[in-house]
Amino acid sequence: DTLLQAEQVGRDLNAAFTIERADEGLGEIFPFLHFPNSAMALWERGGAGYVNPRQLVQAQLTIATQQGATIIPEAVARLTTDAHGVTATTTTGQPIQASKVLIAAGAYSGWLLDRPLDLRRKAVTVLLAELPPGEANRLRALPSIIYRLDNHPVLASIYSVPPLVYPDGKTYLKIGGTLRNTHYVHTAAEIQTWFHGDGDPIEGDALRHVLLAMLPGLAVTAFQSKPCVVTYTAHDLPYIDQIDTAIYVAAGGCGSAAKSSNELGRIAARMVEKAGWDYDLPAERFAVRYA
């Protein structure tokens, strides 16, 4: 039971949380939310919240530049290794030489290696609900939500984050989920085709219905669905490992890595710097597995 697991982790880490019933305390705390009366919720306070991925990436790139990194906004087509190190050749033909390379390219990571990694690339859909200004203000206290669905025919669970202002200046409430019948993409061409579309209309419609049931009376200007790919490893923990003397990999967030990306990156960076594992968790838990 994921709620019991979360409760135990919270107690182990002294997190500030309470267990609330949907038909009692939860409805008083968040009157705009609706769940089945039998539902139980773990409400975390303190540092709980969400990560804005655009701001996170921008902050990481800014700090990297301040520390002397050079950002080259190109895709790598292939890696070649020789006695002098590694050459990364971009899709425009630019060669970049390095003594060591860390591959952290998400769903694309395994295809830069001679031996493919055992990665499962799930094609999923997210839904953005555009909100008028008054509605965004009404929902300003909306928490981040993870909601396990017992009997839904399409979705096993959903997550949602509070309304955010996006680069187009509009405010959106985002919801995504876990499908009961998973759709996988297996090649780079399949991923490209998937990202050129609008996602799965069946999943998008299911997300819309769950959102409107969870937030009765929600005022929405427009809905739009977006494609996404989530990468899973064979053991459902990230691969953070050394492939050979010059190539390392950090890949497979398993749907849970955005909020942990700074620390996962630090683990990988220390591994590259030390030319071996240097962390207080067992290396074998993050070992790569090949297809």
Model-inferred region functions:
Residues 3-6, 23-26, 57, 172, ...:
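A general structural signal for well-ordered alpha-helical segments in protein cores
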Residues 208-291:
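C-terminal catalytic lobe of FAD-dependent flavoproteins
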Residues 49-135:
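Predominantly flavin-linked oxidoreductase catalytic cores and closely associated redox partners
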Residues 6-9, 13-18, 68-69, 98, ...:
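Surface-exposed helix-capping loop/turn segments at secondary-structure junctions
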Residues 5-7, 86-87, 115-118, 188-190, ...:
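Short, glycine/charged-enriched secondary-structure capping and boundary segments
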Residues 100, 107-245:
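Active-site substrate-recognition segment that forms the wall
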Residues 1-68, 72-73, 78-84:
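Flavin (FAD/FMN) cofactor-binding and adjacent substrate-gating region
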Residues 43-62, 106, 203-210, 253, ...:
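Mid-domain beta-loop-alpha active-site segment that forms a flexible
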